Amino acid sequence: MQTLHALLRDIPAPDAEAMARAQQHIDGLLKPPGSLGRLETLAVQLAGMPGLNGTPQVGEKAVLVMCADHGVWDEGVAVSPKIVTAIQAANMTQGTTGVCVLAAQAGAKVHVIDVGIDAEPIPGVVDMRVARGCGNIAVGPAMSRSQAEALLLEVSRYTCDLAKRGVTLFGVGELGMANTTPAAAMVSVFTGSDAKEVVGIGANLPPSRIDNKVDVVRRAIAINQPNPRDGIDVLSKVGGFDLVGMTGVMLGAARCGLPVLLDGFLSYSAALAACQIAPAVRPYLIPSHFSAEKGARIALAHLSMEPYLHMAMRLGEGSGAALAMPIVEAACAMFHNMGELAASNIVLPEGNANAT
């Protein structure tokens, strides 16, 4: 059975030759070179992924939603009751939440995964529960390092199993009351930013309670002293089971040479962890939308990412990842279905990339 170390070691590098061939093909399509902008860049990125066999393509699509509760909820950093995590997870199994509707529209399947809900097991939810909620990061670590490593490996294997069954495009999502607090702590640690710069309102936290949330994040970092150069240390000390789970999806998809669509702020924090654990993950990540959460810009700048959509969304759940799946499919359609300049006897002058 593959270990986490072996999985990380075996993440393939992008195929530079396939990317060069894709760029050459795109430049010869029936349009001025570069005129489809980032759609062209996305197609080239996809072409370099070994799991797609050298060409932009999308088979089955899946959004993996990691559900967990957080001990830091006790610090008054969220307005919703903790039980909402379990209620919404059950709603997801019925297909009635935001991510389910958007995923269905995109033709993607939603996998609802319990990695730490503080409730009885929920029918229809995949059971990977580590515990009933993680520790309160304001007073100690979220979990042990061994728990984080075991969950990373389990989720990575689950992701790779889906790849073997035909999934070629993954999206990540999460569900957990109070989880923007550990996400903000992780972003603060990885980017070296003060908590005040990255703490936002989450799920409509009143402005009068923001200062407390900032203080909680600062305390969590001061008490746990996470090492920003050790992604697993950060996840285990100031993260949460849902954030570890999303990181595991990224590691697993990268191991299979397949793309992962990020969601919003929570997924940015997991992406920072994934890229710290294994920098080889970065070429497989695709930013979907620009989260409305306060620390989004700082996290994305650290990842050197510019999302494709600006929708003022902050729902989470993987909703942005599902919404962006048709953009990935559009890049593939452009690559395979457009005509070629050579076949149309059109010769464009150089420097005509901005023509319409």
From Swiss-Prot:
Transferase in keyword set: yes
Assembly behavior: Homodimer.
EC number: 2.4.2.21
Coiled-coil regions listed: none
GO biological process: cobalamin biosynthetic process
EC class (word): transferase
Name of the featured protein: Nicotinate-nucleotide--dimethylbenzimidazole phosphoribosyltransferase
Lineage: Bacteria, Pseudomonadati, Pseudomonadota, Gammaproteobacteria, Enterobacterales
Family: Belongs to the CobT family.
Substrates-to-products reaction catalysed: 5,6-dimethylbenzimidazole + nicotinate beta-D-ribonucleotide = alpha-ribazole 5'-phosphate + nicotinate + H(+)
Function summary: Catalyzes the synthesis of alpha-ribazole-5'-phosphate from nicotinate mononucleotide (NAMN) and 5,6-dimethylbenzimidazole (DMB).
Pfam family, one: DBI_PRT
Key words of the record: Cobalamin biosynthesis, Glycosyltransferase, Transferase
HAMAP family found in the cross-reference section: CobT
Example of a GO MF term: nicotinate-nucleotide-dimethylbenzimidazole phosphoribosyltransferase activity
Catalytic center residues: 317
Keyword Glycosyltransferase in record: yes
Pathway(s) served: Nucleoside biosynthesis; alpha-ribazole biosynthesis; alpha-ribazole from 5,6-dimethylbenzimidazole: step 1/2
